[in-house]
Amino acid sequence: VHARLAEGCVQARIEGDDISLTCVSGHLEVMSRAGPADPLRLQPQQRLQADAQGHRPVELLDGSAMDQAAAWMRGEVLFRDTPLSQAAAEINRYRRGRLVILGDQLGRRTVTGRYRIDRLDDAIALIQKGFSARARHLPGGVVLLS
């Protein structure tokens, strides 16, 4: 996928072979590497997701989803009924060290909250307390929650 942002802001997220492009403002032109097809033009509140097999249909995001997608620009991470395993992965994008969730049952529990990126250790403490989880702090900023 090739993308060109003339002006505005886009959230780009790459995880393995998956890419997600969300147009926050302005417009974004996206072209496939596969061929000379006309580019897709994303407007604000539109998201395109693609993987090695191609892209899925463009989706229009509601205000809540846009708030979550743009939270990083305000220095925040935002969770709404997010499984703790996914919340930990998002926290790990911004925090030095690693937050590791031990146990599938704990990882499936959901978390809701708005946390400052520069204070993610506070977020971990709140999550630990809210779930009555045990935390083990290891060197290098590694935290094991069980």
PLM region spans:
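A residue-level detector for the "anchor" residue at the start of short, highly conserved motifs
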Residues: 1-146
